[in-house]
UniProtKB/Swiss-Prot annotation:
This is Conotoxin PnMLCL-01. It comes from Conus pennaceus. Expressed by the venom duct. Residues 1-19 form the signal peptide. Contains 2 disulfide bonds that can be either 'C1-C3, C2-C4' or 'C1-C4, C2-C3', since these disulfide connectivities have been observed for conotoxins with cysteine framework V (for examples, see AC P0DQQ7 and AC P81755). Belongs to the conotoxin T superfamily. It comes from the Eukaryota. GO terms for cellular component: extracellular region. The modification Cysteine amide is found at C63. The cysteine framework is V (CC-CC). One of its GO terms (molecular function) is toxin activity. Keywords: Amidation, Disulfide bond, Neurotoxin, Secreted, Signal, Toxin. Pfam families: Chi-conotoxin (PF16981). Its main location: secreted.
Length: 66
């Protein structure tokens, strides 16, 4: 009868200590995705298109051209 409370206490202590494999996998996926995103570079054609559209819409104010 005395072993039951000890077993329950040990069970309660051990359950939060167990790691969640899904949580670890999600964390590793997020880290890997962040590293892959850090390696990517912007396409200069896309940047030229965006700045061109911005400058055309604002009469070349943002580009410094007149």
């Amino acid at each position: 009868m005395l072993c039951l409370p000890v077993f329950i206490i040990l069970l309660l202590l051990a359950s939060p200590a167990a790691s969640n494999p899904l949580e670890k996998r999600i964390q590793s996926d997020l880290i890997r995705a962040a590293l892959e995103d850090a390696d990517t570079k912007n396409d200069p054609r896309l940047l030229d298109y965006v700045t061109g559209a911005c400058c055309a819409g604002l009469n070349f104010v943002c580009c410094g051209k007149k």
